[in-house]
Amino acid sequence: MAVVASTSDDFYANYAFESADRKDENSIRVPRSTEDNRRLKYGHAEDDNSDIAYLNFPVIVPSLVFTVISMGCFVGGIFTSLKSDYIPDERELIRGYVIEYGSSRFRCNTTIPFPADGLPSILNLFELNVIGNVLFRYAVCIPIVIRVFNALTIRNLLRHEYDKKFSSLHKVMADSMPIFTFVEAFMMSLFSIVTVHEDFPEANRFFKIVFAMSSVVSMLTTTTVMFAFSSNSESKWDTVSMIMKLISVVIYVYLMPQYMQYHQSSITFPICHSYMPQLFALMEYFIIIAYATFHLSFLIDIRNISFICFPRSSSGECEPIDPINFKKGAKYEHCRAFEYNQRRILSL
């Protein structure tokens, strides 16, 4: 009795084919029990059969579509807000003036002087201009599902490729990626909807604080896990993605607490114009660019991920979706897993 199959110590690997078996149709064994079937199928790895797949749809396609829509709405919101933005003079700020927000109007006055070197704040623009606010809502609400899906995909990809190298800490951090991604995306959508002047300032403040904290933790966690295994990748694209993440996370984590502290204090007072001191406005610009760059780098990470619908042999039955794959002489002429595996091992 000579062992032709796998030499693993696994229980099902101890099943052997007799070397005296002739390599013809009569040497194929038909299982008589579930245990026998498992033994005969031992070592069978299901091929993805991308060459004869019924469907091969890259995940990056819907991701790009949602990215273009989101970025387009965000940039469009900025331009429309700048176009309709009104800059009051000092007398109007003190005496008060009427601000139009869509069909509603409210009177605003403040004793805080207009910043001499001020620049428009993007968040304040969305706060005071209704079209910009609506486009901002589209930009952050539409891609929530695809963002969480991509985070789950990256988590599963990392755990699949580096499963044996994953420590308990790595597993916890990887599993937290989609959770923090959902929290930050959900909080961003909430503070885009709940405005300061029309709704609840304290709720807006809370949503922004939770967003800031969850986004920082999410970016640090994701970067740490992916950087831990980046040395195993030989692709230049993966290196580019890692560099984008590292630069973005350094900028974001350093600037976000400083900016958020000032922004939270400014919510306490009426927002009568979109301008803020130049330093904090520039901080906001860099934070937004870093945040966008970090999440755009995920498009590189998922570039090879696809939805594939393919013929299976593990089920024990042919899938008659495309009969050409199972005709005589085709790849799956013998599509039953136990038979396919024996023919592979015995080179029939």
From Swiss-Prot:
Give me any GO biological process, just one.
GPI anchor biosynthetic process
Leader sequence residues:
none
What InterPro entries has UniProt attached to this entry? Frag1/DRAM/Sfk1 (IPR019402), PGAP2 (IPR039545)
Domain of life the protein comes from: Eukaryota
Classification via Pfam families: Frag1 (PF10277)
| Example of a GO cellular component annotation carried by this entry | Golgi membrane
Family annotation (PANTHER family): FGF RECEPTOR ACTIVATING PROTEIN 1, PROTEIN CBG16685
Name of this chain's protein: Uncharacterized protein C14B9.3
Lineage start: Eukaryota, Metazoa, Ecdysozoa, Nematoda, Chromadorea
